[in-house]
């Protein structure tokens, strides 16, 4: 199951943006509301809500915020959140996939047009970019919080597809339907998952010059700043000169 890290190429961009934006609570609130609307407020019977609540606790979201969002989801005045995926071509033929959760489709449509006008790139037809990505469950566990052999066996038995070691973390990928069962198996061992979420992993990567890569990263960061954007994925192989920026 081991191999080169398909996630490492993009995860540092996402993590950097999360820390910078201060959007974490807002995103988690939307996930809680959406999960309750789809599956009810009983987390025992709603794995999606259970994962959202774990994210809330990991992010130190106050309990009153969590309770307020659960109650908000049951209100008739609360608009439904729509999950959408935008596909873009960046600079140099790089494919970009944008996951959106919004209560205003017109707003995000306008925001996407402004982003491409300001930073370049074009909106692609549905399927033109995503065919080169696989949606997977992705879990990250710090090496200091787990024993590799025990983690590998538990994850494999629970349905994990891939197990990788990347610097100071173990990265486990699963079919989306097995994300919750693998996470529960890891938690049962007493190992803490630093991240457990659905994500898009490229099948192939595009190599770019440093300047083209900078243009793409500027576009990606602009997209990540948008209110309704949850995650941005790309298949650009980031030049070594930019990996730590």
UniProtKB/Swiss-Prot annotation:
This protein's superkingdom? Bacteria
Name of the protein described by the UniProt record: Probable transcriptional regulatory protein pc1328
Q: Does the keyword Transcription regulation apply?
A: yes
Q: Identify the species of origin.
A: Protochlamydia amoebophila (strain UWE25)
User: What is the similarity comment for this entry?
Assistant: Belongs to the TACO1 family.
**A Pfam family reported for this protein in Swiss-Prot or TrEMBL:** TACO1_YebC_N
Q: Name one GO molecular function term.
A: DNA binding
Classification via PANTHER family: TRANSCRIPTIONAL REGULATORY PROTEIN YEBC-RELATED, TRANSLATIONAL ACTIVATOR OF CYTOCHROME C OXIDASE 1
| Alphabetic keyword roster | Cytoplasm, DNA-binding, Transcription, Transcription regulation
What is an annotated GO biological process for this record, any one? regulation of DNA-templated transcription
Q: Looking at the UniProt record for this protein, which Gene Ontology cellular component terms does it annotate, in alphabetical order?
A: cytosol
Query: Which InterPro entries does this one have?
Result: Integrase-like_N, TACO1_YebC-like_2nd/3rd_dom, TACO1_YebC_N, Transcrip_reg_TACO1-like, Transcrip_reg_TACO1-like_dom3, YebC-like
Asked if Transmembrane helix is a keyword of the record, the answer is: no
List locations, semicolon-separated.
Answer: Cytoplasm
